[in-house]
Regions:
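Internal, active-site/partner-interface "lid" segment
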Residues: 30-76
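Long, charge-rich low-complexity segments
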Residues: 63-78, 218-227, 231
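Active-site histidine-anchored catalytic micro-motif
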Residues: 13-19
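Gly/His-enriched, cation/cofactor- and phosphate-binding structural elements
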Residues: 98-236
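A short alpha->loop->secondary-structure connector
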Residues: 8-12, 30
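Long, charge-rich alpha-helical interaction segments
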Residues: 71-111
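Single conserved hydrophobic/aromatic residue that forms the stacking wall/gate
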Residues: 1-9
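Short glycine/serine- and small hydrophobic-enriched flexible loop segments
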Residues: 20-28
Length: 236
């Protein structure tokens, strides 16, 4: 008898992670006795970005590992690690089966990433506080005059400016040929009414409801940024 996979998936729209859908569908803890409860909870939290203010600024355990392995954190821009992030992820698939987070964080390839992450954390925080400007519900982080953009988890801007429900990162494109506006909604205050993908599409970019980017000519950057600010403020 053919199982009704599609109906189960459709009824799991509110599942916190894709992994949880698969885990539950195939029998949960009985089918996967080696998968710990805390690891599944960590996967749910990461996939749905349900991090607290403190977990963003002071990550530990599974939360820290998530930030380390997220390419958007940017650690790879500053060091040639012994193994690539991709290879480490492949290795961790095997290692996570039989080890807890305490053991995982002691692995040499993980330790070197932890050291670099916290080395950058203070600098990244200071940089964000210096380069950010608040426009009502929006915080704009303009990094175009920064020689070095320090590594940080992608949610730090929301923890530093909790009064804002959406952000724009202004950065140079490749070789400063154009300007990039990367826009995303806060995970701490999910009240933003802007459809980010649709807004970015108006300026040749794209994305989805909660995040998106557009690239514009440098001589149009300030005009476009002003328009983005006005629309986002109007949306609330």
């Amino acid at each position: 008898e053919e199982s009704d996979w599609s109906s189960d998936v459709c009824s799991s729209d509110l599942a916190p992670s894709a992994a949880r859908v698969v885990y539950d569908y195939y029998g949960g803890a009985k089918a996967f006795p080696n998968i710990s409860t805390d690891m599944m909870e960590a996967v749910d939290k990461a996939d749905s970005a349900q991090f607290s203010h403190d977990e963003i600024l002071n990550p530990t355990d599974w939360v820290l590992l998530n930030y380390l392995m997220d390419s958007r954190t940017g650690l790879g821009r500053f060091r040639e690690f012994r193994v690539s992030n991709y290879q480490l992820m492949m290795d961790l698939i095997q290692y996570c089966r039989n080890h807890g987070i305490a053991d995982i964080l002691k692995l040499p390839d993980v330790v070197e990433r932890i050291d670099l992450y916290f080395e950058h954390a203070t600098k990244a925080r200071a940089q964000m506080e210096r380069c950010a400007k608040v426009y009502k519900n929006l915080v704009v982080l303009d990094l175009r005059n920064e020689e070095t953009i320090f590594a940080a988890n992608r949610f730090m801007i929301y923890a530093l400016f909790p009064q804002c429900n959406i952000s724009i990162h202004a950065m140079w494109g490749v070789q400063k040929q154009n300007t990039v506006f990367a826009t995303g909604k806060s995970i701490l205050d999910r009240s933003s009414k802007t459809n980010v993908g649709e807004l970015m599409l108006e300026y040749g970019g794209g994305g989805h409801n909660a995040a998106g980017t557009c690239q514009v000519e440098n001589d149009q950057a300030e005009e476009v940024l002003g328009a983005l600010i006005n629309q986002i403020n109007s949306d609330g």
